[in-house]
Amino acid sequence: MISSRQKLILKAIIDMYSEKGEPVGSKALMALPYLNYSSATLRYDMAVLEELGFLEKMHTSSGRVPSERGYRYYIEHLVTRDNDVTEVFPLIDEVFSKKALGREHTIKEALKLLTDLTSYTAVAVGPDILQSHIKRIEMVPLGLKDAVMLIVTDTGHVQHQQIHISDDMRMDDIKEVIHTLDDLLKNRTLEDALKVLKEEYAISELNQFMSYQSQIIDSFIEAFSKFASDSFYLSGMTNAFEQPEFNDVSHMKRFIDMMDRREIVKLIGTAEGISVRFGSDMEIKPLNQMTIISIPYQIDSKQKGTIALVGPSRMSYQKVIPLLEYIAANLAKLYKDNNKET
C-alpha cells in the first residue's frame, strides 16, 4: 500500500509529533540521518500519505500531523519499543515486590506509578466479577454478638460482610444458614448465585431458618455489590485536564461523570494483544481527541483483566506500550500468586 520510504516518513512524523506536539514539515524530516532525501521527494511522499488518509495538513502550518488512520497503521505495523523504558522497570518491580501489603494496595500503587511516568490517566479492570466462581462461603465469629461472613472466589477476590446477632438469634443457627448457602452456591458464578437465591429449591432449603434468612441473604447481596468496586481501579484522572484537548469545561465535566459511572469499562478492549480506540470509535465528546490504549493480562484459561491508559492521540506509543505490557505481566502474576494462597 505504501512504500518503505513512506513508512519511514510516517513513523518519523508520528514520533516527532508525539514528542513536540507540533506539525512536522519536510525540513524537520531532512534533519534525520535515515531520511536524507531532497525536500521535493519528502514533500511528494507526505502528499501521498495525506491523500491516502494517513496524514492531515494543518491550515496554520505547512507541516503535517498524523490522522487516526495513520496512528492505527503505526501501531499495527511500525511502532517499536523504546529500550530506554526498561530503565524504569526496577521501579515497577519494587511496587510488585510489596504484594504482602495486599493486592488492592499493589494495583493502586502500580497505577499511580504508571500515571507518574506517563502523565496520562490509568485504568485497571480486574477479572469479570460476575463470571468469578464462588470458592467458599464461611463465617468467622467475632465475640458473642457479631460475626463476619466471608465470600472467596476462584479469582482470589475476598469480600466480607459483618453480621450482628440479635438476642433472638443463635450463633449456631447463623453458622447453619451460611453452611447451607455454601452448599447451594459453591462453584457457581456470582451472577448465577443471585439467580439461585430466587429459585424455589433454594428458598425451601433456607425456609427452616426463616428468622435469619432475610438478613443473611441481604448480607450476601451487600457483599456482592462490593465485589464490583474491587475490580475497578483508576489513577491520575486530573492528568487528562492538563491536556489541551480538555480546554472545554463541559468536556471536562462529562469526562469526570464518565469515570464516576465507570462507563470507561465498556470502552476498554478485551481482545488479545494491544487494543487502541480513538475518538471516532467512541462517539463520546470528551474523548473526541483522546485515545484509549489497553492490554489484557491473562490469569488463567477463563479469567483475564485489562490495564489501559487514556491520553491524547499523540501519546508516545513507543514508550507507553512497553510500560503497559510490563505492568500487565506483573498484574497477571499478582493474581495467579494470590489465587494459590486463597
Curated annotation (Swiss-Prot):
GO terms for molecular function: DNA binding. Pfam families: HrcA. GO terms for biological process: negative regulation of DNA-templated transcription. Keywords: Repressor, Stress response, Transcription, Transcription regulation. InterPro entries: GAF-like_dom_sf, HrcA, HrcA_C, WH-like_DNA-bd_sf, WH_DNA-bd_sf, WHTH_transcript_rep_HrcA_IDD. Belongs to the HrcA family. Negative regulator of class I heat shock genes (grpE-dnaK-dnaJ and groELS operons). Prevents heat-shock induction of these operons. This is Heat-inducible transcription repressor HrcA. It comes from Acholeplasma laidlawii (strain PG-8A). The gene is hrcA.
